[in-house]
């Protein structure tokens, strides 16, 4: 329910995107950075339904988009990436983590994460799709996290994992880092 209450609440199910503060925030960000600022953005979510709801908000702004998810045949994925890269009218690339590997999306300047993966490497991989060799723009990576939520707890766990990993592989790390693990 951190993403959109209508995804699980039967009362709100007919219009799940209407009860979604995250989508409201996404719409505000895309309006400012893409519609008014002319930038291209990549929006990641772990959930296909969430990318569908986000796509509705993108259309409402009058922005062009493409959407990649696990159900898109491999033969069509290159076409979607080409449209995003080459068509100035396509400003938003929506993707599940099915699009996390092998995507080269450095023509975007904005990366928006609608949810936080448990594995910090997945988050890094999402960012690497945009911030990579050939990138000529400053990249803005945005995490949309519901405050005081389970999701915020997951973010804290992910940050703890990252801290632990960084200190385990750092030759200068101290032994007290072991205490981070619970």
Please state what every model-predicted region is.
Residues 1-93, 97-101, 172-182:
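Conserved Helicase C-terminal RecA-like lobe
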Residues 64, 76, 80, 91-179:
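SF2 helicase/translocase ATPase core recognition
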């Amino acid at each position: 329910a951190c993403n959109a209450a209508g995804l699980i609440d039967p009362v709100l199910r007919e219009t799940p995107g209407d009860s979604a503060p995250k989508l409201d925030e996404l719409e505000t960000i895309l309006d400012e950075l893409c519609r008014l600022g002319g930038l291209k953005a990549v929006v990641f979510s772990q959930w296909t339904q969430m990318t569908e709801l986000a796509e509705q908000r993108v259309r409402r702004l009058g922005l062009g988009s493409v959407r990649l998810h696990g159900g898109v045949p491999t033969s069509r994925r290159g076409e979607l990436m080409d449209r995003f890269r080459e068509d100035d009218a396509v400003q938003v690339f929506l993707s599940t983590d099915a699009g996390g590997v092998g995507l080269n999306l450095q023509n975007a300047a904005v990366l928006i994460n609608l949810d936080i993966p448990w594995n910090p490497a997945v988050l890094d991989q999402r960012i690497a799709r945009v911030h990579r060799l050939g990138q000529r723009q400053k990249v803005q990576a945005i995490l949309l996290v519901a405050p005081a939520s389970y999701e915020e707890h997951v973010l804290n766990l992910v940050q703890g994992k990252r801290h632990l990993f960084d200190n385990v592989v750092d030759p200068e790390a101290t032994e007290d880092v072991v205490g981070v693990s619970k």
